[in-house]
From Swiss-Prot:
Pfam families: GST_C, GST_N
Listed name of the protein: Glutathione S-transferase A3
Sequence positions that bind glutathione: Y9, R45, Q54, V55, Q67, T68
Keywords, comma-separated and alphabetical: Acetylation, Cytoplasm, Lipid metabolism, Transferase
Gene Ontology process terms (BP): aflatoxin catabolic process; glutathione metabolic process; lipid metabolic process; ureteric bud development
Compartment(s): Cytoplasm
Free-text function comment from the UniProt entry: Conjugation of reduced glutathione to a wide number of exogenous and endogenous hydrophobic electrophiles. Catalyzes isomerization reactions that contribute to the biosynthesis of steroid hormones. Efficiently catalyze obligatory double-bond isomerizations of delta(5)-androstene-3,17-dione and delta(5)-pregnene-3,20-dione, precursors to testosterone and progesterone, respectively. Has a high catalytic activity for aflatoxin B1-8,9 epoxide.
InterPro entries noted in UniProt: Glutathione-S-Trfase_C-like (IPR010987), Glutathione-S-Trfase_C_sf (IPR036282), Glutathione_S-Trfase_N (IPR004045), GST_alpha (IPR003080), GST_C (IPR004046), GST_superfamily (IPR050213), Thioredoxin-like_sf (IPR036249)
Gene field: Gsta3
Domain annotation GST N-terminal: ranges: 3-83
Domain GST C-terminal: 85-207
Transmembrane segments: none
One term under GO cellular component: mitochondrion
Length: 221
């Protein structure tokens, strides 16, 4: 029997958080090995674990996978969260890439210089309210189904619900303006695996605070 996946990253959200979400939603237990110093990262580089010299890296099924999208694609395929055919996969990819466009803005926000944060937050709020959330609300309205693609849970739903939580940390109450997105969040959040992940003490990471930002700088800068 294969061991648990092992996630190599620092103790923060970053590019590993969607991987944590997807594994948790799939009901997969995983271990984490946190980088704490530049030396920790250097050791992974020197032993050949990091193909492109960077993390996230996930040990799974005898592989050492890098590149966030590749890792997510593998997990989604392995645990039947990637649609039933090529067309559904294409739509799922389109939706998850849209989510990623906004998520990357949120990811960088805590790490920005103080003088740039106000403009960045304003852009996040504007893009959320006028571009991304209306687009996904329209999708759900167009087919009237419980999930984004094929009327069953996929990685697109999980990525979107993660995004809804992250946006509300910066723009509280914004999801209330989008009733179908709010219903999707409730639906996914009440799935037993996701509900467990949302509980205190899980491997879900909090918003990157100043301490987390400093820890990341010690490793990566």
């Amino acid at each position: 029997m294969a061991g648990k996946p092992v996630l190599h990253y620092f103790d923060g959200r970053g590019r590993m958080e969607p991987i944590r979400w997807l594994l948790a939603a799939a009901g997969v237990e995983f271990e984490e090995k946190f980088l704490k110093t530049r030396d920790d990262l250097a050791r992974l580089r020197s032993d050949g674990s990091l193909m492109f010299q960077q993390v996230p890296m996930v040990e799974i099924d005898g592989m050492k996978l890098v590149q966030t999208k590749a890792i997510l694609n593998y997990i989604a395929s392995k645990y039947n969260l990637y649609g039933k055919d090529m067309k559904e996969r294409a739509i799922i990819d389109m939706y998850t890439e849209g989510v990623a466009d906004l998520e990357i803005m949120i990811l960088y926000y805590p790490h920005m210089p103080p003088e740039e944060k106000e403009a960045s937050l304003a852009k996040i709020k504007e893009q959320t309210r006028n571009r991304y959330f209306p687009a996904f609300e329209k999708v759900l309205k167009s087919h009237g189904q419980d999930y984004l693609v094929g009327n069953r849970l996929s990685r697109a739903d999980i990525a979107l619900v993660e995004l809804l939580y992250h946006v509300e940390e910066l723009d509280p109450g914004v999801v209330d303006n989008f009733p179908l997105l709010k219903a999707l969040r409730s639906r996914v959040s009440n799935l037993p695996t996701v509900k467990k992940f949302l509980q205190p003490g899980s491997q879900r990471k909090p918003f990157d605070d100043a301490k987390c930002v400093e820890s990341a700088k010690k490793i990566f800068s």
